[in-house]
C-alpha cells in the first residue's frame, strides 16, 4: 500500500511454458500490486493499531477515505499520524498480513494462463529495515519460492513496462507521464466511493471477472 505505498510466476513443473511465454511477442504482461490487492494492508493495520493503542481513536474500515492512512489519522487527532506510521514500520507487519480472499488462487491461475507474464509490483516504504525482506518472505510463504523471481520492487511504477497494472491506489504518478500499462483500480475500503470516468475500469475483488479484463487487452 499506504500507506505506503507488489507473482507469480513460473509454477513448478512448467519452466518451458514460462520461457515460451516470456519469449513470445504476444505475451500479456500484468503487474499486480501487493498491499491492498494481494495482502490485507487495511485490515492488518487496523488490528495492530487497536491492539497497540487501545485507548486512542481509530478510523473504521467503512469510514476510510483517501489512499494515505497516515493523513486521515492525522486529521482525526494530533499525533495520530506518527502512531499510524509506527505500525507499518514495525517488525513483522508486512510478513503477518493476511492474503485478501481469493488473491493467491487467482494470481496463481493468472500466472498459468498461456502467453501471460505476471509480476508482483510493489513499492516498499522508505523505512526499509524490515519491509523489503518481509515482502519477499510473504510471497515465498503464500506463493512458493519460484514466485520470488516475479517480484518487482520500485518506488515508481510508471517506469515499469506492462499491459495492465492492478492496483488499489487511485492516482499513480511518476517520472513517466504516459505509462505503458492500463491501470485497473482494485476496489478497497478507501476507494470504493470514487466514481471512475470511462474508460477507467475497476476490479471489485478477486471474485470479479479478472479474466475478462485480461482478455480485453489481448483483443486489441
From Swiss-Prot:
This is 5'(3')-deoxyribonucleotidase, mitochondrial. The keyword Repeat does not apply. The keyword Metal-binding applies. GO terms for biological process: dUMP catabolic process. It is an enzyme of class 3 (hydrolase). It is found in: Mitochondrion. Residues 1-23 form a transit peptide. Belongs to the 5'(3')-deoxyribonucleotidase family. The active site is at residues 33, 35. Pfam families: NT5C. Homodimer. Its cofactor is Mg(2+). Dephosphorylates specifically the 5' and 2'(3')-phosphates of uracil and thymine deoxyribonucleotides, and so protects mitochondrial DNA replication from excess dTTP. Has only marginal activity towards dIMP and dGMP. InterPro entries: 5'(3')-deoxyribonucleotidase (IPR010708), HAD-like_sf (IPR036412), HAD_sf (IPR023214). One of its GO terms (molecular function) is metal ion binding. Its EC number is 3.1.3.-. PANTHER family: 5'(3')-DEOXYRIBONUCLEOTIDASE, 5'(3')-DEOXYRIBONUCLEOTIDASE, MITOCHONDRIAL. GO terms for cellular component: mitochondrion. It comes from the Eukaryota. Mg(2+) binds at residues 33, 35, 168. Gene3D superfamilies: Deoxyribonucleotidase, domain 2, HAD superfamily/HAD-like. Keywords: Hydrolase, Magnesium, Metal-binding, Mitochondrion, Nucleotide metabolism, Nucleotide-binding, Transit peptide. Substrate binds at residues 35, 41, 67-69, 88, 122, 157.
Amino acid at each position: 500500500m499506504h500507506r505506503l505505498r507488489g507473482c507469480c510466476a513460473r509454477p513448478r513443473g512448467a519452466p518451458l511454458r514460462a520461457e515460451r511465454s516470456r519469449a513470445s511477442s504476444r505475451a500479456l504482461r500484468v503487474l499486480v500490486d501487493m498491499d491492498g490487492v494481494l495482502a490485507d494492508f487495511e485490515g492488518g493495520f487496523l488490528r495492530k493499531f487497536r491492539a497497540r493503542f487501545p485507548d486512542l481513536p481509530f478510523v473504521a474500515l467503512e469510514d476510510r477515505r483517501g489512499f494515505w492512512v497516515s493523513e486521515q489519522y492525522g486529521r482525526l487527532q494530533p499525533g495520530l499520524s506518527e502512531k499510524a506510521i509506527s505500525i507499518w514500520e514495525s517488525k513483522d507487519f508486512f510478513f503477518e498480513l493476511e492474503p485478501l480472499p481469493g488473491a493467491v488462487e487467482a494470481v496463481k491461475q493468472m500466472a498459468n494462463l498461456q502467453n501471460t507474464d505476471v509480476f508482483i509490483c510493489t513499492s516498499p516504504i522508505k523505512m526499509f529495515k524490515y519491509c523489503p525482506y518481509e515482502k519477499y518472505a510473504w510471497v515465498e510463504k503464500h506463493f512458493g519460492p519460484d514466485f520470488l523471481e516475479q517480484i518487482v520492487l520500485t518506488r515508481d511504477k510508471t517506469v515499469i513496462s506492462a499491459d495492465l497494472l492492478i492496483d488499489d491506489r487511485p492516482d499513480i504518478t511518476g517520472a513517466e507521464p504516459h505509462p505503458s500499462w492500463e491501470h485497473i483500480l482494485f476496489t478497497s475500503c478507501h476507494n470504493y466511493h470514487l466514481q471512475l470516468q470511462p474508460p477507467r475500469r475497476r476490479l471489485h475483488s478477486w471474485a470479479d471477472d479478472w479474466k475478462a479484463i485480461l482478455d480485453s487487452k489481448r483483443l486489441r
